[in-house]
Curated annotation (Swiss-Prot):
Gene Ontology biological-process entries: NAD biosynthetic process
Similarity field: Belongs to the NadD family.
Pathway it works in: Cofactor biosynthesis; NAD(+) biosynthesis; deamido-NAD(+) from nicotinate D-ribonucleotide: step 1/1
Enzyme class: transferase
Entry keyword Cytoplasm: no
Name the UniProt record assigns to this protein: Probable nicotinate-nucleotide adenylyltransferase
Amino acid sequence: MTSGRTGILGGSFDPIHYGHLAIAEEVRVLLRLNRVLIIPAREQPLKPGGSVASPAHRLAMARLACADNPFFEVSRIEIDRPDPSYTSVTLQLLHEQGLNDLYLILGIDSVADLPRWREVRRILELAHIVGVARPGAAVDLSHLSQVLPQLPARLIEIDGPRLDISSTDLRQRVAQGRPIRYQTPDAVVAYIEANGLYR
């Protein structure tokens, strides 16, 4: 894996959709990143209930969604690990692979939740935090500097594209027989249909 300014966008991606992709591209362009790693989580520690689709299905959908963007790379780094997908571990592994200029892309609501994350101080040592505004997420971050004094120097706030699309809604729409086209790439729609996901 070549070095350079690298964005990290992790998540369940259950399924991946245009909201994820638009944020990744916005951050890539604004911060002049060499690439963005899309990292599907095997299991998100702070998301109870887990994912609906299997890790293999979510990885496949992410690959299909990113296939036409040469700056996006889908990584198996968390899918292949048996343990929960702790960001601190992932960033450390990427650092050991020579990626030393990392930009962790989070919704601004997730930035507010950082004090609950495992080894958050190590995360801040290993990566810049890119907080992206999302629809319906009016978040006050002023209290965070008291809990995480190093955060202000590592935080980049971006007013990202506000596409009000959620994976939860897409799963519900599929279950109800409603269309999801134009909310996620056609290849992902076809994959969901072909594999009977979310029914």
